[in-house]
């Protein structure tokens, strides 16, 4: 439609119903609150009511901001600000993290955002069937999602998931991959190289499973794919299916349209967990922007859903090299 309008010299605009507001775009899934010092022990045992928590304005007035279901919280004791506590909004309470001490496939959180991300990913599909992770490149979204997937499927083959499926929208080519040579796996191989890179890092980072050389590591990755523990599929082949008991990672979801995201989420089968990953500020798809892409659209409409957990990783939580961070800021 845009192309037709451009040819005819007519201005084309997005549907207002598919745009998110500037305020919605700023929702990060996390907030900071103060907790009375005397209630710290109670929080650690069973959580506390949100009525006991507060923020302070510049004049020192205390107030409780609007909180959303499953919003993550950094709690600071009001008498000892040096040590913070991590929790999550559940109904009218803030409860402590259940998986704070977990190390999925030997991976440990390195910052607050990764603790929150781990909590959302490790929680069962019954309680958290949809997880939305936003953040710039280098915040370990794909890495951590794969690590938890490996923990849930490879280390626990009789557990809740039968497999890990990874998809990426085809932003580099045309929407239809049919014109590319080879079978489905050969067609999507260029899109999935980042998945292999992250998997190599995960496998090689576990001290209990260190591999002696590149060949041994490559053989292990081949085994994982041949056994169907991790599968990669084109987005075109996912839509229309009902996938059960699957840990489904949708990488680079900011390059999907709202309709594509809706088509994926509404077809989730029993026991399936869907993880949407991406950076709304890094869009490669023509005609999509920060406010009209599928990732932002889903994040907006799933706020306050008890079945959706979402978190935005900050730039300070990027785990890439100092050069990469400096380039991101300068370029």
Where are each of the predicted segments found?
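Conserved helicase motor core of SF1/SF2 NTP-dependent helicases
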Residues: 1-45, 101-118, 122, 128-130, ...
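Hydrophobic residues in beta-strands of the RecA-like P-loop NTPase core, especially within AAA+ ATPase
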Residues: 249-250
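Interdomain "pre-motor" coupling segment immediately N-terminal to P-loop NTPase/helicase cores
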Residues: 13-100
């Amino acid at each position: 439609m845009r192309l037709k309008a451009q040819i005819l010299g007519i201005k084309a605009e997005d549907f207002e119903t598919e745009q998110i507001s500037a305020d919605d775009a700023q929702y990060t899934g996390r907030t900071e609150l103060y907790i009375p010092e005397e209630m710290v022990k109670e929080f650690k045992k069973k959580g506390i009511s949100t009525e006991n928590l507060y923020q302070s304005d510049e004049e020192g007035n205390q107030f409780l901001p609007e909180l959303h279901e499953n919003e993550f919280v950094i709690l600071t004791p009001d008498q000892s600000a040096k040590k913070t506590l991590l929790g999550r909004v559940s109904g009218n309470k803030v409860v402590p993290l259940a998986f704070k001490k977990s190390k999925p496939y030997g991976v440990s959180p390195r910052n607050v955002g990764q603790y929150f991300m781990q909590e959302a990913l490790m929680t069962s599909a019954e309680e958290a069937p949809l997880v939305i992770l936003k953040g710039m490149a280098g915040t370990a979204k794909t890495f951590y999602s794969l690590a938890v997937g490996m923990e849930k499927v490879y280390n626990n083959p009789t557990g809740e998931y039968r497999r890990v499926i990874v998809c990426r929208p085809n932003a580099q080519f045309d929407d239809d991959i049919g014109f590319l040579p080879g079978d489905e796996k050969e067609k999507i191989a260029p899109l999935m190289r980042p998945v292999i890179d992250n998997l190599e890092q995960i496998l090689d980072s576990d001290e209990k499973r260190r591999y002696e050389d590149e060949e041994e590591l490559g053989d292990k990755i081949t085994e994982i794919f041949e056994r169907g523990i991790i599968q990669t599929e084109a987005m075109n082949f996912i839509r229309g299916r009902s996938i059960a008991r699957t840990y489904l990672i949708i990488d680079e979801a900011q390059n999907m349209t709202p309709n594509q995201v809706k088509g994926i989420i509404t077809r989730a089968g029993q026991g399936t967990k869907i993880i949407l990953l991406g950076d709304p500020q890094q869009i490669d798809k023509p005609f999509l922007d920060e406010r009209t892409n599928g990732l932002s659209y889903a994040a907006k409409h799933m706020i306050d859903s008890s079945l959706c957990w979402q978190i935005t990783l900050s730039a300070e939580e990027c785990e890439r090299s100092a050069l990469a961070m400096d380039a991101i800021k300068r370029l």
